[in-house]
Structure formats: C-alpha cells, structure tokens
Amino acid sequence: LSATPISIMSYSPQKDHPAAEPRKWPRSKGELCPFSLGTGMCLRLGSLFLALGLLLGFWGCRGDGTSDAHALCIAGSTSVQPFAEKLAEVYMQQHPGERIDVQGGGSSAGIYAAQQGAADLGASSRELVEAEKALHEIPIAWDGIAVIVHPSNPLNNLGLEQLRQIFQGKITNWRELGLPPHAIDTITREEGSGTREAFEHLVMGKTFITPGALVQDSNGAVREIVAGDPYSLGYISAGLVDDRVKAVAVDGILPTRENIKKQTYKLVRRFLLVGRVPPAGRCRALVDFILSPQGQRLLEAEGLVGVN
C-alpha cells in the first residue's frame, strides 16, 4: 500500500535534558518518578514504565489482522485517538460484525506496541526516529499544533521566539507580553507524547521545556486546564480546539485548516499509522477506507487536513 508522498523535515525527538534541582514529589500531575533525578531521566523512566504497562493491555485487543476472531487494535497517540475513533465508528457501521478497538497511551507507546506486535496499527503524531524506521508507515492526515489560552485572555498573537521563551521559563509573567500582571501557568505534555516531541522540535529547537511547566497526559487534559484557568497557556492538536479555549496566532498566522494545508502556519506535523509489515486482510481494508475519499472527508470534517 502506498500513500501520496509528502515531504516533511525529519527530526529525532531523542535528546539529553539538563539536570534539575532535587524537589518535593509529586510536583505536578504527570510526574512519575519519586526520586531526585534530572527531569528528563525521571520522565523517561515514567514513559518506559507506562509503555510497558500499556503493552500488556494492548495484547488483549490484538488479533492477527486477517481473521475474524479478534478486534483490530489501533493504539498510540492521544492526538490521533479521537479521529481514529470516529473513523472506526463509521467503518463498523458500514461493516457489521467488524470490531475495531482504539486505545491511547501516547505515540511512543503505540509505536512500541506495533513493533512488538501487540497492536495491529500504532498511531503516531510524530515522525519515526531512526530505530523505528523499519516499520511500515502510512500518513493519514496533516495537523497543526495550536497554542491555546483561556477565551477571556486578550492575547491574539505570539512570536515564535516569545513562545520558546515562555516554555523555557524565561518569560514567566503576562506583564512581559503587555498584559495585566499575573504569572503564566504553562501547561505541557508528558515525555513520550508525539505532540510534545513535535512541539520540542518545531518550537524549542535545542532548548528545553522548563521543569516548572505543569505536565498533562493528553490533549484533552491540557484543554480542560486551559479552559478553566484564565492565566494558563498550553498547546494541543489544532483539530481539537473548540469554543472552550482560544487558539492564538504564531508569528501572525492562525492554525486554520487552509494555513496548515499551505504550511504558512509553521507548527505542522503528520498523523501516521504504523505496522511491522504492510497491512493485509482486514487491516488493509480498514487502511483503504481511511485513505479513501470518504475517510479523508471524515478527517477534514473533524478539523484535519487530508493527505489525498
């Protein structure tokens, strides 16, 4: 199976992290390690344990992709998850008796599950790193990473450098952006999240997200916090922005579908499905549906940009 070739700058989300001072635990939701380790090591260990735990759960839904004995399992990115659930719902309506189980867990966990054969398809919102490139990848959509604030926040635009400095912890107060004084409540995703890894590549470059940021384990959790906190700032899949939060422009460009399609909006990444081998049988039929005009229209209707 082949999809329309798409050119995108490749990157590796793996990098070293600066050491953090010992601190009381737990500091924030999403911090998984109760030891005085560096921030990167602490969260990497947490991501590893999470991936191993999820892998055991994924085995329960995994069939062989060809027989009718088990549900097909799609597992991984929480950014891809709601869109995969919509596709699965429509596909099962059109194919009575077919069963598709969609699970989250994060891009890295989904990729690992696909590598180990614990999921028929892994879902990723980041590019594959070198050690993962033996997997067969299928681009299914383009998505933007939207920077979001509370609807009451008058902020409408951030420069890319300003955004970087906020997440570095160099800009910490709304006063520094010309707004009434109050500390900025910075919200980020956990390590292992494809959204975070894409954000680190596209925004942070060789710098690091401040240990002072509140860590959340899904796009939905970030959105809920920002929706309830007038002083917060976070980032989520552009396809998941709703009227509870406000997306701000980056360098004067909003994350609209047209701007994502043209890539005038710079925070853009692909959504991928991955497997150990090219899909066959029931799995191939599902992928064909996702890449069909109907499947792509469904993704477009949900706020993504189709690849075909």
Named regions from a protein language model:
Residues 61-108, 112-308:
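Exported/periplasmic ABC-transporter solute-binding proteins
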Residues 6, 20-29, 307:
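Short, low-complexity, charge-dense intrinsically disordered segments
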Residues 5, 21-22, 36, 53-55:
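Short stretches within intrinsically disordered, low-complexity N-terminal or propeptide regions
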Residues 44-57:
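Bacterial N-terminal signal peptides
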Residues 2, 7-10:
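Low-acidity, Ser/Thr- and Arg-rich intrinsically disordered low-complexity segments
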Residues 11, 16-17:
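Intrinsic-disorder-associated, low-complexity terminal segments enriched in Asp/Asn/His/Tyr and depleted
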